[in-house]
Amino acid sequence: MARDYYEILGVSRDTDKEELKQAYRRLARKYHPDVNKEPGAEDRFKEINRAYEVLSEPETRARYDRFGPEGVSGAGAGFQDVGDMGGFADIFESIFSGFAGGMGSPTQQRRRSGPARGDDLRLDLKLDFREAVFGGEKEIRISHLENCEVCSGSGAKPGTRPRTCSTCSGSGQVRRVTRTPFGSFTQVSTCPTCNGTGMVIEDKCDACDGKGANQVTKKLKITIPAGVDNGTRLRISSEGDAGQRGGPSGDLYVYLFVNEDEEFQRDGINILSEIKISYLQAILGCRLEVDTVDGPVELIIPAGTQPNTVMKLENRGVPRLGNPVSRGDHMLNVLIDIPNKVTPEERELLEKLAKIKGDRTGKGGLEGFLGNLFK
């Protein structure tokens, strides 16, 4: 049986992204095959990588939390090559950059001057109550970086090309060796000439001022799944900022917030509301229409219904997120309206009823809920 990924990384299930990254760094440093030559270290390292690969991505983490390893059996591309690891590359660099001689420096050089993924973006979106219940299409407006169409993202004027930085020879890093009585120490820092890109643009593109990207505002249509709630996060792939040097774009994360409704409240996948009936309807029973998110529905009030009775309309609640065929219920709290005053005709009838029931009436003292009507 596969070990729990949280257990592998030594973290709790509610750990945040930063704590997860710190745990991964600590274990990756300890079990990396180039550092740890003990039997089983390489397998342990692969196990750690797999756990972090799943838990560091919000969508795969959510599937893992719900379905376990079977829910993420196809997630991730594995760890074939450190140079192709995207976000993992930065972590590895921070783990191993302190080793003498700059461990893995050829890979670091290729990475700094190679493709870089664009930044992820966040957008907060408000929904009406019924939009959150039933979902649907929503148009949003976003502002993000897109590759310059004139220079195709290179930042160089058309007809020219960036040149290799002469300061760092294209590595994006400069090294300084300090000799001491205890040995030589190498300090690695970002190249100040090319800012770590390994390339220098001499003739900048006029359209983007050499940045390779422009800020663009555009409209998008996104699909809101049925059953979303406050805090639900949607990922819109490749709609973040453009990548650098041919790298992929980041993602857009849309955080959903649901406006309150005057009539309905939500409790998980159930909907709550109140209905007010007269005392006679409560005593005798009745049929009446009540509002639901699906529209008016007939409700039968049984005779003798007591105040604060909760009545259930099955399958009239919120669709279950990810399985909209399954819905919660609509729970109605019955409030009974007892009038402060009654007409003379009503009073006469109620007094007759009180005599039949044997209740005392008049100023001498009243019993039962009818008493308030005779004051």
Swiss-Prot record:
Swiss-Prot/TrEMBL cofactor(s): Zn(2+)
Entry's free-text remark on domains: The J domain is necessary and sufficient to stimulate DnaK ATPase activity. Zinc center 1 plays an important role in the autonomous, DnaK-independent chaperone activity of DnaJ. Zinc center 2 is essential for interaction with DnaK and for DnaJ activity.
Binding-site list for Zn(2+) 2: C165, C168, C191, C194
UniProt-listed InterPro entries: DnaJ, DnaJ_C, DnaJ_domain, HSP40/DnaJ_pept-bd, HSP_DnaJ_Cys-rich_dom, HSP_DnaJ_Cys-rich_dom_sf, J_dom_sf
Assembly mode: Homodimer.
Record-annotated J domain positions: 4-68
Alphabetical keyword list: Chaperone, Cytoplasm, DNA replication, Metal-binding, Repeat, Stress response, Zinc, Zinc-finger
Gene: dnaJ
Protein name: Chaperone protein DnaJ
Highest taxon listed in the record's lineage: Bacteria
Protein family per UniProt: Belongs to the DnaJ family.
Record-level Gene Ontology MF annotations: ATP binding; heat shock protein binding; unfolded protein binding; zinc ion binding
Annotated disulfide bonds: none
GO CC terms of this entry: cytoplasm
Role of this protein: Participates actively in the response to hyperosmotic and heat shock by preventing the aggregation of stress-denatured proteins and by disaggregating proteins, also in an autonomous, DnaK-independent fashion. Unfolded proteins bind initially to DnaJ; upon interaction with the DnaJ-bound protein, DnaK hydrolyzes its bound ATP, resulting in the formation of a stable complex. GrpE releases ADP from DnaK; ATP binding to DnaK triggers the release of the substrate protein, thus completing the reaction cycle.
Free-text comment on the cofactor: Binds 2 Zn(2+) ions per monomer.
CXXCXGXG motif repeat ranges, renumbered to this chain: 148-155, 165-172, 191-198, 205-212
Binding site residues for Zn(2+) 1: C148, C151, C205, C208
Gene Ontology biological process terms, A to Z: chaperone cofactor-dependent protein refolding; DNA replication; protein refolding; response to heat
Location(s) in or outside the cell: Cytoplasm
HAMAP family named among the record's database cross-references: DnaJ (MF_01152)
CR-type zinc-finger residues: 135-217
One Pfam family, short name: DnaJ_C
Matching NCBIfam families: DnaJ_bact (TIGR02349), PRK10767.1 (NF008035), PRK14293.1 (NF010886)
Chief location: cytoplasm
